[in-house]
């Protein structure tokens, strides 16, 4: 299935691989000649006949149709290890979904005894400046807050000043990238602080270009979620700090949680930038059924349309994995139709 979803499906949906720097999703004769010589990733689309092994695959492929903008999806059943992906190996803008990795990098320092959850640091508040006027956007120090609160608001409220506060403490983007590499996750890169990322947003259209700065693949983000959830990367206490913050997320109510049944718990982190919306998280159902999902949507005409696409894909992923695992939905009884009368 992964071979089809990672290759055949990409072509079947009309998607094209991109090179490392921001480039249009097109090729010309010069690029084709260069590609032939040096084996780069930019290639003319090949023709494939879409073959689906299951109706689950077909449904996700239909929902992730990229005709109006690239859509990347990756998900894994955390109980069985079964995976599904569409453009799962292609880079998408991280936006604020990177904040989970920033929190994890800080919590490692807590476990090493260098800091604690009560250590206080100042918020880093952006100072108005023109786009691209400096390598890094200027910031000023704001109120001091304990690290535990910084982590909670950077995830649950997507606070940029809180994120940049901890990003500076851990050693900047390079330190977060290093933490990810040490966990075995390669297709992830933070290159700027959030203040700079937001100030300079809009340089490229993510629906037609790939900017390798501040980007990751959906598969990489699912690997991050899986490792955190299963306790592979951090201690049980640190793991719970992140999951609790994700469970309190206030942003993205129209994304992953929007179409979920009331009996599931969603722990997630959203991301939004120019012409792109994303949501990554853990969906826990009854009987311990849990999946990790990463959904990155570009284009589609408007933010509301992107959010609706995320919601429908997330529900289809949950239902598809639950059905394959034989997880029954809890029966909800009305006041006039309960067992025994």
Features from the language model and the residues they span:
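Structured C-terminal helix/loop/strand segments within mature extracytoplasmic catalytic/sensor domains
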Residues: 26-59, 63, 168-169, 173, ...
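Active-site SXXK
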Residues: 81, 93-123, 293
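Active-site-proximal loop and beta-strand segments within enzyme catalytic domains
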Residues: 108-153
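Bacterial N-terminal signal peptides
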Residues: 10-20
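Mid-domain, small-residue-enriched loop/turn segments at the edges of structured enzyme/sensor domains
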Residues: 70, 143, 151, 164-225
């Amino acid at each position: 299935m992964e071979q089809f979803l990672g290759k055949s499906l990409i072509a079947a949906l009309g998607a094209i691989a991109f090179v490392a720097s921001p480039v249009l999703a097109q090729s010309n004769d010069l690029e084709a000649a260069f590609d032939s010589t040096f084996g780069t990733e930019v290639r003319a689309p090949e023709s494939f006949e879409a073959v689906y092994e299951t109706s689950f695959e077909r449904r996700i492929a239909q929902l992730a149709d990229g005709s109006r903008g690239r859509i990347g999806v990756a998900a894994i059943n955390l109980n069985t290890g079964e995976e599904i992906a569409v453009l799962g190996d292609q880079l998408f803008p991280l936006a604020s979904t990177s904040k989970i990795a920033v929190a994890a990098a800080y919590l490692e320092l807590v476990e090493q005894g260098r800091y604690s959850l009560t250590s206080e640091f100042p918020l880093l508040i952006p100072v108005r400046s023109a786009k691209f006027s400096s390598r890094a956007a200027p910031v000023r120090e704001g109120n001091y807050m304990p690290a535990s609160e910084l982590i909670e608001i950077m995830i649950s409220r997507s606070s940029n000043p809180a994120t940049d506060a901890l990003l500076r403490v851990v050693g900047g983007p390079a330190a977060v990238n290093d933490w990810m590499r040490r966990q075995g996750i390669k297709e992830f890169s933070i290159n700027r602080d959030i203040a700079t990322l937001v100030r300079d947003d809009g340089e490229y259209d993510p629906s037609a270009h790939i900017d390798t700065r501040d980007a990751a693949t959906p598969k990489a983000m699912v690997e991050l979620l899986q490792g955190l959830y299963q306790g592979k990367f951090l201690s049980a206490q640190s793991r719970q700090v992140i999951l609790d913050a994700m469970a309190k997320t206030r942003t993205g109510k129209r994304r992953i949680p929007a179409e979920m049944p009331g009996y599931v718990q969603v722990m997630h982190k959203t991301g939004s930038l120019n012409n792109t919306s994303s949501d990554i998280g853990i969906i826990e159902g009854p009987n311990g059924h849990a999946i990790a999902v990463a959904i990155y949507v570009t284009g589609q005409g408007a933010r509301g349309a992107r959010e609706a696409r995320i919601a429908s894909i997330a529900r289809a992923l949950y239902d598809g994995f639950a059905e394959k695992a034989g997880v029954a939905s809890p029966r909800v009884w009305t006041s006039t139709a309960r067992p025994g009368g």
